[in-house]
Amino acid sequence: MKKKAGILTTYFAANYGAMLQPFALKRVLEQQGCDVEVIRYGQPDIVKSYSPFYWGRYFQAKVTSAIAAWLFAPWAIAKELRFRRFMYRYINGEQGFAKEIPADKDVYYVGSDQLWRTFGKDEHFDPVYMGFFETRPGARKVSYAVSGEHLELNAVNQEYLRRAMANFDMISVREQTRADDFAPLAGGKPVEVVLDPTLLATPDLFAELESRDPLPGKRYAVFYCVRRSQRFIHRIYEYVQAKGLELVVFSEGFKPSLISFALRHRGVHYLMTAGEEAFLGAMRYAECVFTPSFHGSVFAIINHRDLYSLLVEDGHDTRTRHLLSLLGMEHRLWAIGQPMQTSEIDYDRAEASLKQLREHSMDFIHRSLN
């Protein structure tokens, strides 16, 4: 009889990595013979942050933010609908959010992504992501590759985490720094470091997904802009001009400075409403990739692209630093004031490291199911 597995994560956010990681974990578990459901839990703070249909964003305290939300609403809605089509096709075909966590699973996987952190102005934890939900007797709760980069480990948070970790039968995180932080709070349970699902899955799984080349027949670079990395755009443009490339730009949210830059510079294509299909195609066909994004770096690595991992130096570069250090690619980290590194990436070495890390991560999955 098939084991029933449930996944709790930010599957609904119109963000490239947020949807690709639950797809990957779902398919890996299905390959282990599981009946898998990505549970339709909509974490309220994340829903409000991403959804253009949350009307509160149009009446914000900051007038400039409210005006920007109104101006970009048509593009935000178009992008949201593209991501929803992907979600219904590949992740969970049911619309809306579940009113409660289904209690019929044998194993519940919480992860991956930034789930073990605080949300909102009052800095609260999400009780579901922290394992405070009812299950049938004998069901297991497992954290898989959770991250908590945006988390202050003060005394109050440590006490909450200590109680929350008691909910879990097995614990794994994505970064060694968090494993070191959480180990004293885990009640003696080991806190293991495992690969993000997008790297746990073998690359052939992503061939199942529809993708399209956003600039067929053209040579181009990709800039995936998240956080405040738009300040790199002039340096990136100098590089692509010197190489005779065009530039395809993706972003999280909408960046007015990038709109202006694309209008004023030849060969810059800012794909404001692009969905997963264009992202996957661009990561496959681009000659090089510039991004501070963890998942942007992941898909450049999967496709053996020439990666420049941008250091925004805002306190949130930990995840990418850790990944590149595991793969012997630290030389591809680039801060704005530094010269670009042009030495080649040794992808044979990186793949050898990934093979070992996949084996350990799959061992964790096997133990969680048995």
Model regions: which residues?
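Active-site anion-handling motifs in enzyme catalytic cores
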Residues: 1-370
